[in-house]
Design a protein with these regions (language model features):
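Glyoxalase I/VOC metalloenzyme domain signal
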Residues: 1-45, 53-103, 115-131
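Generic short beta-strand
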Residues: 50, 111-112
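Short, small/polar residue-rich loop motifs at catalytic or cofactor-binding pockets
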Residues: 107-109
């Protein structure tokens, strides 16, 4: 095709970032992540266990890994979704309507902590009220 990888440093080639979310019941959490990220399914692949993509093609793809047993310890990472302050309320409402729960709004206007049905956390953040 005539495409060439242009290194950005020693030994550097192409890098692609994806987010993988472990889940016991993928169809129960996928709608939450679709709503909170404002993502879509790939054309022709929008089933209950299919990956999600950023419709603007700027953010990483999100895919779901089937787990056989729950993991009792707390997640060691979480996702921050930064949105314009005037979109935060509607993004949170969409995520809650899609099965999410509000974990904390103690720092509301700066960020809210939400979780999907299996406890995977995401913070919806804005620039307001930052320290």
């Amino acid at each position: 095709l005539g495409l060439e990888t242009v290194p950005r440093g020693p030994g550097r080639s192409v890098q692609k970032l994806e987010l993988a979310i472990d889940a016991m019941d993928i169809p129960s959490i996928r709608p939450f992540w679709k709503a909170v990220l404002a993502y879509t399914g790939e054309p022709g692949y929008d089933g209950p266990t299919d990956p999600l993509i950023d419709p603007t093609r700027e953010g990483p793809a999100v895919w779901f890994q089937q787990m056989d047993q729950p993991r009792p310890q707390r997640n060691r990472i979480h996702v921050d979704v930064s949105v314009p302050h005037d979109e935060a309320d509607s993004r949170i409402a969409s995520a809650l309507a899609a099965g999410g729960t509000l974990v904390s709004d103690r720092r509301a206007r700066a960020f809210w902590v939400l979780a999907d049905a299996e406890g995977n956390e995401v913070c919806v953040t804005t620039w307001q009220d930052r320290d």
